[in-house]
Amino acid sequence: MAKIKIQQVRSRIRCPKDQKRTLDALGLRKLNQIVEHEATPSILGMVNKVRHLVLIVE
């Protein structure tokens, strides 16, 4: 599988709990933090759920 890098670019303040939990599941806890994951359907679904808070870094 391909690897993707995900960066949190917007704050989690005022986000619903499910979106905060999704960020936690992705390993994103701070602004501008970058994590690397395999591009599995479950990870891509999580990224899609919080797409307004994160950026895919190539």
From Swiss-Prot:
CDD domains: Ribosomal_L30 (cd01658)
A GO term for molecular function: structural constituent of ribosome
Any Gene Ontology biological process: translation
Keyword Ribonucleoprotein: yes
Annotated Pfam families: Ribosomal_L30 (PF00327)
A cellular-component GO term for this protein: cytosolic large ribosomal subunit
Keywords: Ribonucleoprotein, Ribosomal protein
InterPro entries documented for this protein: Ribo_uL30_ferredoxin-like_sf, Ribosomal_uL30_bac-type, Ribosomal_uL30_CS, Ribosomal_uL30_ferredoxin-like
Subunit-structure text: Part of the 50S ribosomal subunit.
HAMAP family documented for this protein: Ribosomal_uL30_B
PANTHER family membership: LARGE RIBOSOMAL SUBUNIT PROTEIN UL30M (PTHR15892:SF2), MITOCHONDRIAL RIBOSOMAL PROTEIN L30 (PTHR15892)
Protein family according to the UniProt entry: Belongs to the universal ribosomal protein uL30 family.
Name of the molecule in the record: Large ribosomal subunit protein uL30
Organism: Porphyromonas gingivalis (strain ATCC BAA-308 / W83)
Lineage: Bacteria, Pseudomonadati, Bacteroidota, Bacteroidia, Bacteroidales
Gene name as annotated: rpmD
